[in-house]
From Swiss-Prot:
The gene is rpoC. Belongs to the RNA polymerase beta' chain family. NCBIfam families: rpoC_TIGR (TIGR02386). Its EC number is 2.7.7.6. Binds 1 Mg(2+) ion per subunit. This is DNA-directed RNA polymerase subunit beta'. One of its GO terms (cellular component) is DNA-directed RNA polymerase complex. Its cofactor is Mg(2+); Zn(2+). GO terms for molecular function: DNA binding; DNA-directed RNA polymerase activity; magnesium ion binding; zinc ion binding. It catalyses: RNA(n) + a ribonucleoside 5'-triphosphate = RNA(n+1) + diphosphate. Mg(2+) binds at D460, D462, D464.
Length: 1413
């Protein structure tokens, strides 16, 4: 028995491992893998189909072709297992060893491995410090390289051409040794003393100052260090033995007709073997050098093609003119091993069919066609039939099922009971694309789907198909039921709002039911409850919409979960009273006592979930759906052509617009307006006309006049079907109705510009040919956009998932006090997003105090739920510091407190939740809804761009942030500092509005003053930037010489003369160094100092500045000295939509980016060069000044002598996130990216929670650059994983050594994915070759921390239910390591399961043998 056990143990390999290491293979290593040398290029004998001996498919090397049978047939059967046949030399074993046994080829001449040679940066080139060109010339036998110099003046590694070599031979004879080919490179690599070389380089690094040289040296040091640490030898990058892939991985299959289908690898191997054998023969014959050399070069090329075809020179093609697939091609790309087979496995058995509506289903059910269920649950049915004794064998059971006997259907019913199935609709963009349902057997062939889950699947019933999968194991069924059941996924993981929301018919039905009507039948009745209301409606005593009084009993939920009833008579309508019947206990009547639109219904479900929990909500949702369908049918809403009422005023409006356009045309012809102005004005006129028509139409549609009980005329909301559909949010929008009954309006040309003649007709009137033609542009552009968009959006999602896949919640609390300060998002006078929406579901980072007191309102580490948020609003708190993933201190993963609420469940997030993937899906899934367009600023947008004043909307107090100001001669306040923020604050100290106030704005009211709504508080000229004096005195011109630095111009209309400063480019040579400026002096001509500084008041004027003062004029503070015209930005494209999101996550530097101040200090300008000016910032504390060259054409926001803070904007433009991170820190960059991304999604009306974007930002910030390494193991300037630096510094601090200093880096998502610690994950993402080359040289170890690596190696992922499994595994390992079992008795210790499994395997195989006999 013991022997049997030992034997079985040997059969099953140990598969338990914790990490995967990749490194270079030494020749001995390759030989140790190999089971024999492949000597012949033959594959199989085409007559007998038996593999040739010593060939590429040789059975002696790779194992038998048939299970337990040698090639010549002497030994067959299991009893001979392990015997090696003396005749044919084949070991008798399973044939699957042909998938794992490797062979090798002994190369007659060493060959360079192309990956280490040509994959940039070339590793061989870096190690030898030789240019790649030279190495290639040596390898491909074009030049010699000196290896031993001897007593000559040649240098080691010097390249010699044929002539130079011959000359040197004549001169020095045998003194030196030079050669060519891979042998030369190999001996050079062998000669490198890694440790010594490394030391020399470090010394050199400390002595050099040139930046480029330092970079090169660090690269070499890093490479050498990685060789030393990984125990790789450089000469292993040159192959002397070539491994041969197991034959079953490069199959050769006979087709009928005597032909063979073969893997390309066989061709490539054959080439190598042929050339290698020929080379061997030539060497034995001592052939002439030139022939041998040519053969060696050909061998090198053959091996290059085998490893990576097409990397160097032209790819080798097969018989069909296609390049052959090499080993590298096998693993990379979408069709490669990683993405096709390891990450993208197909499901073994599933069904698929068209979907139809199942309006009678419950939320957790789906209709499954009987035929399909029978097929999917076959094995279960067979099992049941056998257990019941209804069938004796599986074969008999199979027959019964095939005949579809009556008993089979009963069994099927039993099997299916409470066995969930998974439904999946492609494309699965987020986790709600696969949900579990309990199947209900139905006739027919289509799957029936519950209408409420359509939103999650993004499904409709116009021919969509869905796939059905059966979870087999008990665990799988449990997970399907507990985690994936549709009833457990009521909230969307992206924003925490219900995703099970009624749409279309249901919304229309509920809307119709809850509408009110004046003077309806039965108005004014008093009813004793909902039942009576339904009764009078059914008996047609009253209409659905009549206003009545009803006795309603509401139930309020108590703290102890009991309900307190409260009855009162409420004014409502019949329909609302009927609807109240389905509302669960615990909700107030007020939620149905209103006209319910789509938003209100969603809110109603949300309230229900928050107050009553999951079960009542699910039941309520179902009831809502049934009721909605029923009453939509009763409403009889339909669309007829008469419902599209065209307003009477339309003709008039259009006529007026045409007259205005004609006027402008006349002005243009008489030369009063330019062509551009005319075009813009015409478009404005038509846009306004369209608005007027639309308004008239909506007024017309949305109201009707009726007589009330007293016979007076009254207006009420209309019951027009089209209006009801749009108003309820069931289908359609005001914009679509406008096209049906208003006018279609302006159309765009394919290039995006607007055609100035609008389509005045609407769809009811019909379009003429020209109008129809114009409108085809837009439609086609839309279709083309959609196709592009889908692909781009999918790629964005893939990159996001890849960068965030390893982020999992791993601990409860990391204990950090850091956080993000959340304030309401206010733009101008509108609150874009109130504070409660931003902090809901977050954890507080510090105590929140009641304003103006020391009392604690909310403790630190409180999860803010709806009740807490109400409390915040009650105490009018307008900023809260909450914890954020970006600040989380957890080394690997995130802690639950920093993440906060699990949006799809409504409680604190669980350990093991894969928040990275959820974040990626939440951002990627709405990607297809974003536009692809880049907008031209046109029409409405440009009006917003040229604001020239601030008008207040709410009453309040003015609060100016970082403002400096002076009072001018007329007593008004003039702002003299930049990025001033004006906030309007109400009595509760809450910010209501925020505005940006530009430099030079004139304020009507000052800081702390009270303003009323509608007041204008600031004015400025939008087209020029003024230069404002801060002191009073007399103007003195400096360096302002007419014709050299300035020119005088007279205005034609006013006759006033003004001085214009010339740009340096426009000046003559004499004027180049002049720096025109205005100095302010007192009566005696002494400099006036700016108050509070030692600086004289001197204002330097930039080019193009206009001065309207004369020399020696008296001025007072706050007056304008000069004006700099703003070049109107013209139509700058703002990138919008999807491309903008991609740019943000890729952290791309924008074109013409804003220039920020690197340090705080005083601005001055130094010597100018041809196209640039020198900006100098001198710190106040006297440390070193900072200089920067700035192109002349940039408009600067600062003047000489102005004080700036680090991170202030010096020249406007889009800001680069890298600059923000460097100068303002992690918080600022997080805020910037979150706001910018949200801006894009908000425009499309998509809600995504901020924390998803923060999760991605955390991943973008996971690298840092070491500045000073201190006592750590890092190099200066090396880029390291941030968590590694943190861990290392923690250890160094404990030992009181010097920790490393570092700066955080922001990487784009593609870069960040490729820079992960896990090489398996990076290789499966992009640039597989480069990643694997780098990792092999460095001998990297993959700890298998992320999800992707574990999927690839075929394990449970360390998230979700797999999280517990991995923890358990680690604990088990830990206990095994601590109490090592004594070795002597461990051999016989084998678990019962293992023994039984092994035995059954053995018995099965013997049984099979008997069957055959």
């Amino acid at each position: 028995m013991k022997d049997l056990l030992k034997f079985l143990k040997a059969q099953t390999k140990n598969e338990d491992f914790d990490a995967i290491k990749i490194s270079l293979a030494s020749p001995d290593m390759i030989r140790s893998w190999s089971f024999g040398e492949v000597k012949k290029p033959e594959t199989i004998n085409y007559r007998t189909f038996k593999p040739e001996r010593d060939g590429l498919f040789c059975a002696r090397i790779f194992g038998p072709v048939k299970d337990y049978e040698c090639l010549c047939g002497k030994y067959k059967r299991l009893k001979h297992r392990g015997v090696i046949c003396e005749k044919c030399g084949v070991e008798v074993t399973q044939s699957k060893v042909r998938r794992e046994r490797m062979g090798h080829i002994e190369l007659s001449s060493p060959t360079a491995h192309i990956w280490f040679l040509k994959s940039l940066p070339s590793r061989i080139g870096l190690l030898l410090d030789m240019p790649l060109r030279d190495i290639e010339r040596v390898l491909y036998f074009e030049s010699y390289v000196v290896i031993e110099t001897g007593m000559t003046n040649l240098e080691k590694r010097q390249i010699l051409t044929e002539e130079q070599y011959l000359d040197a031979l004549e001169e020095f004879g045998d003194e030196f040794y030079a050669t060519m080919g891979a042998e030369a490179i190999q001996s050079l690599l062998k000669d490198i003393n890694l440790v010594k070389e490394c030391e020399n380089l470090r010394i050199e690094l400390n002595e050099t100052n040139s930046e480029t040289k330092r970079k090169k040296l660090t690269k070499r040091i890093k490479l050498l260090e990685s060789f030393i640490q990984s125990n790789n030898k450089p000469e292993w990058m040159i192959l002397t033995v070539l491994p041969v892939l197991p034959p079953d991985l490069r199959p050769l299959v006979p087709l009928d007709g005597g032909r063979f289908a073969t893997s390309d690898l066989n061709d490539l191997y054959r080439r190598v073997i042929n050339r290698n054998n020929r080379l061997k023969r030539l060497l034995d014959l001592a052939a002439p050098d030139i022939i041998v050399r040519n053969e060696k070069r050909m061998l090198q090329e053959a091996i290059d093609a085998l490893l990576d075809n097409g990397r160097r020179g032209r790819a080798i093609t097969g018989s069909n003119k296609r390049p052959l697939k090499s080993l590298a091609d096998m693993i990379k790309g979408k069709q490669g091993r990683f993405r096709q087979n390891l990450l993208g496995k197909r499901v073994d058995y599933s069904g698929r069919s068209v979907i139809t509506v199942g309006p009678y289903l419950r939320l957790h059910q789906c209709g499954l066609p009987k035929k399909m269920a029978l097929e999917l649950f076959k094995p279960f049915i067979y099992g049941k039939l056998e257990v019941r004794g209804l069938a004796t064998t599986i074969k008999a059971a199979k027959k019964m099922v095939e005949r579809e006997e009556a008993i089979v259907w009963d069994i099927l019913d039993e099997v299916i009971r409470e066995h969930p199935v998974l439904l999946n609709r492609a494309p699965t963009l987020h986790r709600l694309g696969i949900q579990a349902f309990e199947p209900v057997l139905i006739e027919g062939k289509a799957i029936q789907l519950h209408p409420l889950v359509c939103a999650a699947y993004n499904a409709d019933f116009d021919g969509d198909q869905m796939a059905v999968h059966v979870p087999l194991t008990l665990e799988a069924q449990l997970e399907a039921r507990a985690l994936m059941m549709s009833t457990n996924n009521i909230l969307s993981p992206a924003n925490g709002e219900p995703i099970i929301v009624p749409s279309q018919d249901v919304v229309l039905g509920l809307y119709y039911m809850t509408r009110e009507k004046i003077n309806g039948k039965g108005e004014g009745m008093i009813l004793n409850g909902s039942n009576e209301a339904e009764k009078v409606y059914r008996l047609e005593i009253a209409e659905l919409h009549s206003l009545v009084k009803v006795r309603i009993t509401e139930y309020k939920k108590n703290k102890d979960q009991s309900f307190i009833p409260k009855t009162k008579i409420i004014n409502t309508t019949i329909g609302r009273a009927i609807l109240w019947m389905i509302v669960p206990k615990g909700l107030p009547f007020s939620i149905v006592n209103q006209t319910l639109g789509k938003k209100d219904i969603s809110k109603m479900l949300n309230t229900c979930y928050r107050i009553l929990g999951l079960k009542p909500t699910v039941a309520f949702a179902d009831q809502i759906m049934y009721t909605g369908f029923a009453y939509a049918a009763r409403s009889g809403a339909s669309v007829g052509i008469d419902d599209m009422v065209i307003p009477v005023k339309k003709l008039n409006i259009i006529h007026e617009a045409e007259i205005e356009v004609a006027e402008i045309q006349e002005q243009f012809q008489s030369g009063l307006v330019t062509a551009g102005e005319r075009y813009n004005k015409v478009i404005d006129i038509w846009a306004a006309a369209n608005e007027r028509v639309a308004k008239a139409m909506m007024e017309n549609l949305s109201t009707e006049s009726v007589f009330n009980k007293k016979g007076e005329k009254q207006k009420q909301i209309s019951f027009n079907s089209i209006f009801m559909m749009a108003d309820s949010g069931a289908r359609g929008s005001a914009a679509q109705i406008r096209q049906l009954a208003g006018m279609r309006g302006l159309m765009a040309k394919p290039d995006g510009s607007i055609i100035e003649t609008p389509i005045t007709a609407n769809f009811r009137e019909g379009l003429n040919v020209l109008q129809y033609f114009i409108s085809t542009h837009g439609a086609r552009k839309g279709l083309a956009d959609t196709a592009l968009k889908t692909a781009n959006s999918g790629y964005l999602t893939r990159r996001l998932v890849d960068v965030a896949q390893d982020l999992v919640v791993t601990q409860n609390d990391c204990g950090t006090h850091e956080g993000i300060l959340m304030t309401p998002l206010i733009e101008g006078g509108d609150v874009k997003e109130p504070l409660r929406e931003r902090v809901l579901g977050r954890v507080t980072a510090e105590k929140i105090l009641i304003p103006n007191t020391e009392n604690i309102l909310i403790e630190r580490n409180t999860l803010l739920n709806e009740q807490w948020c109400d409390l915040l609003e009650k105490n009018s708190i307008d900023n809260v510091k909450v914890r954020s993933v970006v600040n989380c201190e957890t080394d690997f993963g995130v802690c639950a407190y920093c993440y906060g609420r699990d949006l799809a469940r409504g409680n604190l997030v669980n350990k093991g939740e894969a928040i990275g993937v959820i974040a990626a899906q939440s951002i990627g899934e709405p990607g297809t809804q974003l536009t692809m367009r880049t907008f031209h600023i046109g029409g409405a947008a440009s009006r917003a761009a040229t604001e020239s004043s601030i008008q207040i909307k709410n009453k309040g107090i003015i609060n100016l942030n970082n403002a400096k100001s002076v009072t001018n001669s007329s007593g008004k306040i003039v702002i003299t500092s930049r990025n001033v923020e004006l906030n309007i604050i109400d009595n509760f100290r809450r910010t209501k509005e925020t505005y940006k106030v530009p430099y030079g704005a004139i304020m009507a009211k000052g800081h702390g003053e009270q303003v009323n709504s509608g007041e204008t508080v600031a004015k400025w000229d939008p087209h020029t930037i003024p230069v404002i004096t801060e002191v009073s005195g007399f103007v003195r011109f400096v360096d302002m010489i007419d014709g050299q630095s300035i020119t005088r111009q007279a205005d034609e209309l006013t006759g006033l003369s003004s001085i214009v400063v010339l740009d340096t480019a426009e000046r003559m040579t004499i004027g180049k160094d002049l720096r025109p400026s205005l100095k302010i002096v007192d009566r005696d001509g002494n400099d006036v100092l700016i108050s509070g500084t030692e600086m004289p008041a001197q204002y330097f004027l930039p080019g193009k500045a206009i001065v309207q003062l004369d020399d020696r004029v008296q001025i007072s503070s706050g007056d304008t000295l000069a004006r700099v015209p703003q070049e109107s930005g013209g139509t700058k494209d703002i990138t919008g939509g999807l491309p903008r999101v991609a740019d943000l996550f890729e952290a791309r530097r924008p074109k013409e980016l804003a220039i920020l101040a690197e340090i705080s200090g005083i601005i001055s300008f130094g010597k100018e060069t041809k196209g640039k000016r020198r900006l100098i910032i001198t710190p106040v504390d006297g440390s070193d000044a900072y200089e920067e060259m700035i192109p002349k054409w940039r408009q600067l926001n600062v003047f000489e002598g102005e004080r700036v803070e680090r991170g202030d904007v010096i020249s406007d433009g889009p800001e680069s996130p890298h600059d923000i991170l460097r100068l303002r820190g992690v918080q600022a960059v997080t805020k910037y990216i979150v706001n910018e991304v949200q801006e894009v999604y908000r425009l499309q009306g998509v809600k995504i929670n901020d924390k998803h974007i923060e999760v991605i930002i955390r991943q973008m910030l996971r690298k840092a650059t070491v500045i000073k390494s201190g006592n750590s193991e890092f190099l200066d300037g090396e880029q390291v994983e941030f968590s590694r630096i943190k861990i290392s510094n923690r250890i160094l601090n404990k030992q009181s050594k010097i920790p490393a200093t570092f700066s955080r880096d922001l990487l784009g998502i593609t870069k960040a994915s490729l820079a992960t610690e896990s090489f398996i994950s990076a290789a499966s993402f992009q640039e597989t070759t480069r990643v694997l080359t780098e990792s092999a040289v460095a001998g990297k170890k993959d700890e298998l921390r992320g999800l992707k690596e574990n999927v690839i190696v075929g394990r449970l992922i360390p998230a979700g239910t797999g999280y517990a499994y991995h923890k358990e595994r680690l604990n088990r390992r830990h206990t095994v390591n601590t109490n090592q079992i004594k070795p002597n008795n461990s051999s016989s210790q084998i678990s019962a399961e293992e023994a039984s499994a092994s035995l059954s395997e053995l018995l099965n195989s013997t049984l099979i043998q008997h069957d055959h006999t």
